[in-house]
Amino acid sequence: TETEMMRYIKRLDRKDISLAHSMIPLGSCTMKLNAAAEMLPLSRPEFMCMHPLVPEDQAEGYRMLIENLSEELKTITGFAGVSLQPNSGAAGEYTGLRVIRSYLESIGQGHRNKILIPASAHGTNPASAIKAGFVTVTCACDGQGNVDMEDLRAKAEENKEDLAALMITYPSTHGIFETEIVEICNIIHACGAQVYMDGANMNAQVGLTNPGFIGADVCHLNLHKTFASPHGGGGPGVGPICVAEHLVPFLPGHGLFGNPMNEVSSAPYGSAGILPITYGYICMMSTEGLTMATKAAILNANYLAACLKDTYGIVYRGANGFVGHEMILECRKIHEETGISENDIAKRLMDYGYHAPTLSFPVHGTLMIEPTESESLWELDNFITVMQTIWKEIQEVKNGEADKDDNVLVNAPHPEYEVVGDNWEHCYTREKAAYPIESVRENKFWINVARVDNTLGDRKLLSTRYGTF
């Protein structure tokens, strides 16, 4: 019955933490608010009942929205052309590289097959480059997390004749603004190659700078990050690419329009159903609002960094002592001194009602945190309180006040069925496990399962088919 279906969906909802409960601090994911007003078009049949291959004269309004959104994205990125076809950020990377290849072939440079990728670039870059048929060359970073300029110059010169492009993320995945970004672009262009800017961290650029101004040739955007469409359980993503004037002729076409060059989606405008959300976000925010959002995102990240630097420590800071829109929290020393790992800290955060941050990426043994502009001062302060309380729990282990093999960290998370069960054999109280601070008492989110073996779970998928709801 519909009633059963409704209750089934609600049961699933209760198992899943979301922004409706607390901040999701996943670094490099930009888990910002998906405002209800932006989502309104999803309930309108004029948008949702439109077939991707509908005749053009029956989709004039939708085409107008697509054209207007494309103009907005060109203005934001400082580029001359846009394709909305790619269905994810990684698909955008792949598409951008295909565009670069087509351009190079058009000027008799099709032999160029190497992509230079700094160690601080976004994680999908090497895979996208290889998928697009290129060979990757890694460029080192210095001790401050910046691209090592000497190594960059050496690698660029060494591969000068075969270099197709540099893929670089700005701000970098280390959470800092590369001070030499313009010079980096100049070095690559001097080799006859193109600059691909990964837009994963565009939330720290909008309104303050843009890839075109910096000197890039192509970038992709993540509408599900910077531009507020939902991540939605791993999708749906939209990863449009924006390109400089000389690359516009090589943007993806579509067989429907008689030009399948660089086509990457079966639908001419990709996941077009998502576009009204982003269009609504941009129109409601306006230029001033988008710029303020960028400033607030950077401010929030630096506020967290300032409050956590004396306990955990921040791995990388920019030349001015600040981070970008995210930070990497140092946990390696904690593990050396106490045996408590970044994994233990991440799982303990679940007991406090928070989604775990990004774990051991891009630096092993660390946590990457991105608060976005959407979080209030109260939420930031509560998260700081939680992290400092966990720090105290770590110190209890370090000082011998808590058993190193049986404590709230190594046993986290603590689901309800475990806390209320008849047998409780831990050295600490049920209250310490489940209700460590007052804010948790007021807004408890119960995790569904106790600790699982991450590696075993990743390597051995066990699927279950349910006969009924």
Region locations from a protein language model:
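Mobile "lid/hinge" segments at catalytic clefts and subdomain interfaces of large enzymes
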Residues: 236-305, 309
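Conserved PLP-enzyme active-site core in the AAT-like
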Residues: 61-64, 91-260, 340
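Short glycine-centered, acidic/aromatic-flanked micro-motifs in structured strand/loop junctions
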Residues: 86, 141, 168-171, 329-331, ...
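A glycine-rich, aromatic-flanked flexible loop/lid motif
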Residues: 128-130, 268-273, 358-361
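General small-molecule cofactor/ligand-binding pocket signal
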Residues: 83, 137-139, 357
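Non-catalytic terminal extensions of PLP-dependent enzymes
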Residues: 1-81, 98, 118, 149, ...
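Conserved phosphate/anionic-ligand binding catalytic regions in large, soluble enzymes, centered on
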Residues: 17-38, 85-96, 227-242, 270-274, ...
